[in-house]
Amino acid sequence: MKFAVMGRMGAEEAIGPTVVAGISNADPCGGRSRRKSSRRAGGRIACAICWAMLPLAASAELSNDSLLGPGLRYRPAYDGSSSQRVELVPVIRYFGETWFIRSTQGVLETGVRTELAPGLHAGAQLAYEPGRKSSESAFLRSHQIAEIPGGASAGLQLEWDHTVGPVPITLLARVRKNIDSERGAQADLRLSVGVFHGGPVSAGIFGQATWADEKSTTSLYGIAPQQSAVTGLPAFQPGGGLLFSSVGLLWSVDLNPKWVVVGSLESRRLSGNVADSPLVERRSNGYLSAGIAYHY
């Protein structure tokens, strides 16, 4: 399940006070002109504002804090559909010594992982792979397109967590092979960066690219000759390659030390010849999700 959420940011931990002190206790200007002093003070204020905007700790994609709660997601019936739906989704993340489960990196997945070096983890996962319901799309119903049932995938991943100054960064590479051999395999590359922290409010941005082999694209967007005869749509055979790219915003608001409201906004665009499939009504789709989670 696609659900990128934000977790709790850390306490103030002196960034604000330290920077402010740096401004208010600036060295005397001595014999320098007022203009130079003004420029220097302005530069210090600008730096202070920039540093104050940076997060002190990681968001849900950028930390390992445990989360559990319900959420709602507004999504297309499938990528490329003009129909939108609302569904209930989990907000979950837990990391044990080796075992983990989470919904905060684009899919609902569980598995094991090990630390290869500080901040670098390798692992294996089982993930939920959503299907495609004709009942959710007027276009699919009108053309008698068969449903694709939800399923599962197995794969490997490599994740790097790092900080540049106070900025948390997570880079995730993941390969997913569907348990149903006819649905092929996909690979994800996802980058998440924390960009804002002010009081109880935190925010981050992310970008993702997903590639798919020919089996995967054909199962999702292909039209076989026999299907063409039934649906009235032209036969279409997509190849493998970049499936979609997306960018998004992550946010969270701490209600208290134990409860947090989380959410995300994502714009996703189909790529390659998949975007030319007769099943694609529009190349770009939006996702909106929000939920409430308990820190445990």
Regions found by a protein language model. Name each.
Residues 98, 160-162, 177-260, 264, ...:
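Outer-membrane beta-barrel transmembrane domain signature
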Residues 54-59:
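N-terminal signal peptide c-region/cleavage motif recognized by signal peptidases
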